[in-house]
From Swiss-Prot:
One GO-annotated biological process of the protein: defense response to fungus
Record carries keyword Ion transport: no
EC numbers for this chain: 5.1.3.6
Gene name of the encoded protein: GAE6
Protein name: UDP-glucuronate 4-epimerase 6
Organism from which the protein derives: Arabidopsis thaliana
Subcellular location: Golgi apparatus, Golgi stack membrane
Amino acid sequence: MPLSATADTSKTVKLERYNSYLRKIHSTKVLNASSKVLFRATLLVALVLVLIFAINYPPLSDSRAAAAHHLHRRSFLSTGLFSSSSSSSSIGGAAWEKRVRQSSTAKRPHGLSVLVTGAAGFVGSHCSLALRKRGDGVLGFDNFNDYYDPSLKRARQELLEKQQVFIVEGDLNDGPLLRKLFDVVPFTHILHLAAQAGVRYAMKNPQSYIASNIAGFVNLLEVAKAANPQPAIVWASSSSVYGLNTENPFSEEHRTDQPASLYAATKKAGEEIAHTYNHIYGLSLTGLRFFTVYGPWGRPDMAYFFFTKDILHGKSIDIYRTQDNQEVARDFTYIDDIVKGCVGALDTAEKSTGSGGKKRGQAQLRVYNLGNTSPVPVGRLVSILEGLLGTKAKKHLIKMPRNGDVPYTHANVSLAYKDFGYKPTTDLAAGLRKFVKWYVGYYGIQPRVKKETSHAEDSA
């Protein structure tokens, strides 16, 4: 074989080997690239699955409030604004928007358009009915959690629906839902009454108080500051902010830096947050410090309510005494008086001064006590209930726990009287008579309640 032919063959073999080597390198790069793409795709799918799981399942916790929040979030995401369904009856649909507008539209000239959060609650339902009765537009908002019997909240909802007040079911931390409501309705006012209530429960489930009373409040303020126009906001603080204050009666200028419970601390935090949003964004904000509200359609976790239940069922009731063996006293305030205070605050609330999330001028910032001004020992409350129910209570006197509660409350309401004419008119005996009448009727109990014998009490 000629030398030239041998050389050509050798070159050909080397070239083929080189090309083979290049093909191997290319294949390896393709494989590596494919692996990276596959890994990223797998990671993306995993993240999507985690998101779906988080939306559709409540946390592995015994927190009832947290579970309720996740359930309502799931309901909104699956049937509401982000749903592919075209059903007009779902949240965000045409029929839903029509109900929202109709409920929010005032029936009187220059009437208010009010978003009432916690509308299925005790104070919220009464305020919603009062506003509707005088011709204001009212849209309710509530998450119907199970802190106490949800069937009572549903019964209040039925009362409101009979007066054409629609309640949107949702959570305060659901920003898209709140923004949707403000897209549909230019609310003039917000009456913010939604909150996680209860002093003792805060020791068992502190997270629910942070989620509702702080995070939920901030979320509502964030939506309100961006609204056009910005609404004026009246919201429920609490007499509990006075905490370990020893000055008597409690006045708005007294110190509130010693909360005795987490519930009180969240309400105090709310007052500071309100100041911040007023200062930075020009939101008009009025805080109302309620003092032990009672009356028909009340909360089952309140002493007067479960005392009534236990007395009728022959169960023993615990009556607290202070550590130095004094009677515990509360400034019990009848619901109708609280409603008058809420409406008065709404009527005197000035417009917010912000626009597009920016402050344009000084805005109104207020805080008021709403109480009865007449503290009554808890033992006296029990005696009144015994007389109304015709049954002696089985009393168990115990020392009040050192942590979480306070021995007495006493409201000075002179500022609320001065600014919007707030004046409580219902004493405890008259108010409890109205509550007991409602209680035996609502729960279908054979009436053993004594008839009214005092014209003075009847007209109180």
